[in-house]
Amino acid sequence: TIFAFFMKIRELKIDDYNQVIELWTKSFNNKFDNKINPNHLSDPNSFTLVSVDNNTITGVASIYIIRKLTRTLGLIEDVAVNQNYRGKGIGKKLVEKLIGIAADKKCDKTVLNSSKQNSEFYKKIGFEKNEIQMIIRN
């Protein structure tokens, strides 16, 4: 059996929220509270892309443009691909498009946080290990 699909990448729409939350929940093994920031879609510094096969969201990834005092930073977050579609280049294509957005927005650098298990994936795209992240959960 040949598994073929058509990958379309587009910006997130309100109608996508339920599928995105379900994908994040399965991918990150935790519950999301169904409360996507209502200002996200209208924020000119927030971009979320989805890959779609027919009406199924197969992947999602976001970038936030942060204008700091001396430079502009692109922060990639929440990259997830439906487990049935992994290994088909979806995650790579989503991240590459986000890097393109960062370049268009004149970001000085683009960063992301990765689990150890996904770090090789990001290295293949061109990311390199740089700093240790420290965190306090509020």
In which residue ranges do the predicted regions lie?
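A short beta-loop-alpha structural element at the N-terminal edge
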Residues: 7-20
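Conserved acetyl-CoA pyrophosphate-binding loop and the N-cap/start of the following alpha-helix
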Residues: 85, 89-97
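Conserved GNAT acetyl-CoA-binding A-motif
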Residues: 95, 102-115
